[in-house]
């Protein structure tokens, strides 16, 4: 499922160091020649395509990125040291454009690709550069050149890692709002979500995953009833499905187990591959169940639903149980990413041989 994630950043490469005016001071030499060194270049700003990242969420927390300026030149023919470079890690597929003009400047298409997005300024010349037969004691120097400064827009077509599956009003939108930066429309009537909502869940620095809230399914969705059919296909590219169930429906005549079975039935009818995808059961709205009844109600649901996979009990409204679920999701998604990016095993007998045409 593709969505566009975007972020705006300001980058500034380092200015070059200034040149130095200096003269040699040696014993018995009253007029030593010029020995002022050049300034060091400013630090560059690089971007590298990191296959372990899948969102731009970190750039929303740190917008400005500056490299160090170069050191000034010194006497005794000493040049200033170059300023330290900085490297920004971005997901593969990031498009970098000028935020002011909209012009596309760079695209990070291959893992490990490195590009220079802002070049550091050159260092200024020291007075030793201006010595000539006519001018034996020059006092000229030049300042360092300014580094490049850019306002950039980052765009990434994002594939959702996790899809939320469930009946209308199961609490999917509330869950995505509780754990991510998404703010879906939420109300107490079915089909509040009319379009897929994307949320980026940030677990830590450079640790995040993408969750998609799909409009609620009803029985008959695989044949195109309700809003289900056009969105079921969005779940096919996800790494994990969360089956969200309302454990305390307002209408007491509604059986959560029957609803859950209907969802699984639609999934199986629509696509066997989707049915076989890793799926976790998330029992929501625990805050609506008296604490003394919770264990019995969960046990009864799991038994009648004949469920043998992972079960998580949460209240999206109060966020109870959400943190352990988020951590488990990240570990699962990260493990799948590592497996997907692992290099293919090479038969040791043929290691180092060129590929045969």
Curated annotation (Swiss-Prot):
InterPro entries: G_OBG (IPR031167), GTP-bd (IPR006073), GTP-bd_Obg/CgtA (IPR014100), GTP1-OBG_CS (IPR006074), GTP1_OBG_dom (IPR006169), GTP1_OBG_dom_sf (IPR036726), OBG_GTPase (IPR045086), P-loop_NTPase (IPR027417)
Family annotation (CDD domains): Obg
Segments forming domain Obg: 1-159
SUPFAM superfamilies associated with the record: Obg GTP-binding protein N-terminal domain, P-loop containing nucleoside triphosphate hydrolases
Compartment annotation: Cytoplasm
Entry similarity comment: Belongs to the TRAFAC class OBG-HflX-like GTPase superfamily. OBG GTPase family.
Protein name in the entry: GTPase Obg
């Amino acid at each position: 499922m593709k969505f566009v994630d975007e972020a705006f950043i300001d980058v500034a490469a380092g200015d070059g160091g200034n040149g130095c005016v200096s003269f040699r001071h040696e014993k018995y030499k009253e007029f030593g020649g010029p020995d002022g060194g050049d300034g060091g270049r400013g630090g560059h700003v690089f971007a590298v395509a990191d296959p372990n990242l899948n969102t731009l969420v970190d750039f929303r927390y740190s917008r400005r990125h500056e490299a160090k300026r170069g050191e000034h030149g010194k006497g005794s023919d000493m040049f200033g040291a170059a300023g330290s470079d900085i490297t920004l890690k971005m997901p593969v597929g990031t498009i970098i454009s000028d935020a002011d003009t909209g012009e596309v400047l760079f695209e990070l298409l291959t893992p490990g690709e490195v590009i220079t997005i802002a070049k550091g300024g050159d260092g200024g010349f020291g007075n030793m550069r201006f010595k000539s037969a006519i001018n034996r004691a020059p006092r000229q120097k030049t300042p360092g050149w300014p580094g490049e400064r850019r306002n950039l827009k980052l765009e990434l077509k994002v594939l959702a890692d996790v899809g939320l599956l469930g009946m209308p009003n199961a609490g999917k939108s509330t869950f995505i709002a509780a754990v991510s930066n998404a703010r879906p429309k939420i109300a107490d009537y079915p089909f509040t979500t009319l379009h897929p909502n994307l949320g980026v869940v940030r677990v830590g620095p450079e640790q995040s995953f993408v969750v998609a809230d799909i409009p609620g399914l009803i029985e008959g969705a695989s044949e195109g009833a309700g809003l289900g059919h056009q969105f079921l296909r969005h779940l096919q590219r996800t790494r994990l499905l969360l089956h969200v169930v309302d454990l305390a429906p307002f209408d007491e005549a509604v059986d959560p187990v029957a609803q859950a079975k209907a969802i699984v039935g639609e999934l199986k009818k629509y696509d066997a591959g989707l049915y076989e995808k890793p799926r976790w059961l998330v029992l929501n709205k625990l805050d609506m169940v008296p604490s003394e009844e919770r264990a019995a109600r969960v046990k009864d649901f799991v038994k009648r639903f004949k469920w043998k996979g992972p079960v998580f009990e949460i209240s999206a409204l109060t966020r109870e149980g959400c943190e352990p679920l988020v951590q488990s999701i990240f570990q699962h998604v990260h493990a799948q990413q590592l497996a997907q990016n692992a290099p293919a095993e090479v038969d040791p007998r043929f290691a180092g041989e060129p590929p045969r045409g």
